[in-house]
């Protein structure tokens, strides 16, 4: 015992051993999804569409779970034109029975379920003083309840079939209590998305014993159709004053970070959490917002570096 305890550890040999055990990146990023089956809620548009695209690019078989048939058919046409193996199941994630039906469809069609991404979401702009109960319920049912029970349905299948799968919940930068500057008006949406973050942590604590990785991505503003429809509804409710404040947000700022990003910027991170890259991640929420929530310096201030304000000072 004493001899073993006192034995000198060779750091170079340990490093070589670790390197030998490491999986090649080709296997992690390219080959890891081949033959895998993924279910993506809200996969017919926005972030979900880009997640489906990335999973298919890695040769996964993907099922889109969404409500609207017309939009889903257009998405299927896009993906199948590229030779991707994709199908659609009509799903209203606010209904628990639909969540379970989506998992049943996926496992019946493809014989497995390895990855779940819950990107279906609903939101709009209402002042806390104005929010109707039915709008609150709709957002909570889709954003929070839908993620919870779709995740439960997927997890039950994975546990029963001893699948060490990946579950990725989608939250939002709103979970930090942030909203459009000068406007806000998304308290109920923020509450739902904060719930998704808490759910990720606690559900992960239960499912890790089965080898299931549960993590979350919290995107900032993205250029999706929902951004424009949500704005139209708010303009009608609150008039030109709302539009003026919204339009002035960020105007005149030299900050190169866009207020809204291509959803593929987020989809790439979601994809990574679906791969062996996330094998040692449990219950984490990854913020992907381009730094838009940071306290940012709006001018390149420096008195030592040329090209900044005020620039190098003369030696005294």
Please tell me what each predicted stretch does:
Residues 182-183, 221-254, 265, 295-316:
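A glycine/serine/threonine-rich, flexible loop-to-helix segment
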Residues 4-28, 271, 282-316:
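Short C-terminal tail/terminal secondary-structure segment
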Residues 159, 168-195, 200-209, 221-223:
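Catalytic loop of short-chain dehydrogenase/reductase
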Residues 151-152, 201:
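A short, exposed helix-loop element centered on a Lys and neighboring polar residues
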Residues 127-128, 132-140:
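Substrate-binding pocket helix/loop in short-chain dehydrogenase/reductase
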Residues 117, 208, 213, 281-283:
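Short, small/polar-rich loop/turn modules that mediate ligand/substrate recognition or access, typified
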């Amino acid at each position: 015992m004493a001899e073993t305890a006192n034995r000198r550890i060779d750091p170079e040999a340990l490093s070589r051993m670790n390197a030998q055990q490491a999986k090649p990146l080709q296997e992690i990023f390219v080959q890891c999804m081949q033959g895998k089956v993924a279910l993506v809620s809200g996969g017919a548009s926005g972030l979900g569409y880009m997640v489906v695209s990335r999973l298919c690019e890695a040769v996964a078989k993907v099922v889109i779970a969404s409500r609207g048939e017309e939009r889903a058919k257009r998405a299927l046409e896009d993906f199948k034109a590229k030779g991707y193996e994709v199908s659609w199941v009509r799903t209203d994630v606010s209904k628990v029975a639909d969540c379970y039906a989506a998992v049943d469809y996926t496992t019946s069609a493809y014989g497995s379920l390895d990855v779940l991404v819950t990107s279906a979401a609903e939101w709009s702009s209402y002042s806390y003083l104005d929010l109707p109960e039915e709008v609150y319920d709709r957002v909570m049912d889709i954003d929070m309840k839908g993620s919870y029970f779709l995740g439960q349905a997927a997890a039950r299948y994975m546990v029963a079939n001893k699948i060490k799968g990946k579950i990725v919940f989608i939250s939002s930068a709103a979970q930090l209590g942030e909203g459009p500057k000068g406007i806000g008006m998304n308290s109920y949406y923020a509450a739902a998305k904060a719930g998704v973050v808490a759910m990720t942590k606690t559900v992960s604590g239960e499912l890790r014993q089965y080898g299931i990785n549960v993590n979350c991505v919290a995107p900032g503003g993205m250029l999706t159709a929902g951004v424009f429809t949500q704005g139209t509804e708010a303009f009608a409710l609150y008039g030109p004053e709302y539009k003026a404040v919204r339009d002035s947000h960020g105007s005149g700022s030299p900050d190169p970070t866009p207020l809204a990003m291509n959803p593929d910027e987020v989809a790439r991170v979601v994809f990574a959490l679906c791969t062996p890259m996330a094998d040692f991640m449990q219950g984490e929420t990854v913020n992907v917002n381009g730094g838009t929530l940071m306290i940012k310096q709006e001018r390149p201030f420096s008195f030592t570096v040329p090209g900044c304000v005020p620039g190098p000072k003369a030696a005294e």
